[in-house]
Amino acid sequence: ADNLSICDYKDFISAHKNRPANTEITMMTFTTDDPKSCGVIKIDNSGIIQEFHEKVQNPPSTIANGAVYIVEASVISYMERLKKVKVDFSVDVLPYYMGRIFTYYNGLYHRDIGNIRSYELAQIETNFLYRKTS
């Protein structure tokens, strides 16, 4: 994926370990300033994904898929059973597990850097973050 993420990975792992029953994937999420360019999600009160919208014209939220996941072994087994040379996680896996994907919100820093403008912005923002914490 073309994302830059700064987060507390121990907290992310802890969230996965303590996720609701019957969930097999924990997805990192973030607030995007450009929801039309991202896969955005809608979650229930437990933080479980109920809807996923990939780069739609009228996104229903600004909470986006960070494309960073922790998965159970059962998810890997499912992917192997697909018998594909290339598995597209957004197309082949996420829809199958809809309603069984827990979310972890990264409030520290996450930016899609898939174009020059966002890449340059990430350089400025992360330089600012590091100066602020030094």
Regions found by a protein language model. Give the residues of each.
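A short, conserved acidic/glycine-rich loop-to-beta-strand motif
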Residues: P20-T31
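Short, structurally constrained coil/turn elements
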Residues: R19-A21, I43, Y97
